[in-house]
Amino acid sequence: MRKSDYDKLPFVAVTDALHPCLAGWDKIAAELQRAISRGRLEKPILVVDCYPGVDELAVLHELTSRLTPKLVIHAAEAYHSPEKIDTLVKPFLESDNLVFGRFSSLSLVNFFDAEPLWRFRRIIDELKEGLVLIVG
């Protein structure tokens, strides 16, 4: 039997002394604010993508309280319902191979409801200035 190459404890070693890792919300927010200011955009859009299991609401709260965005969007508000997602993925899980199922032809957009996405886009387009924060 082949040994699994699944890494249960993945990590990335950071050795660049010019760009150290930041710990703590105050330091993270200050660095983000510096980057936003350098861009000199009237309507900067900051998107924070999260790994599964991350407390997105905590990230949203911490960044909102420190960056004071004009508009805050939690991407989960545009997801299809869990029932709809179950229906979407069910054909790919029904297989003779109970461990791996079948390869899926779905893409990320399949998991979102088009109406909230268009609503968010309209709201962003109508905003003339100020930071837009999207988390999720």
Where in the sequence are the language-model features?
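ATP-dependent small-molecule kinase phosphotransfer cores
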Residues: 2-29, 58, 68-130
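Glycine-rich P-loop/Walker A and Walker A-like loops and their local beta1-loop-alpha1 context
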Residues: 18-65
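Structural recognition of the conserved hydrophobic beta-strand(s) that form the central parallel beta-sheet
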Residues: 131-136
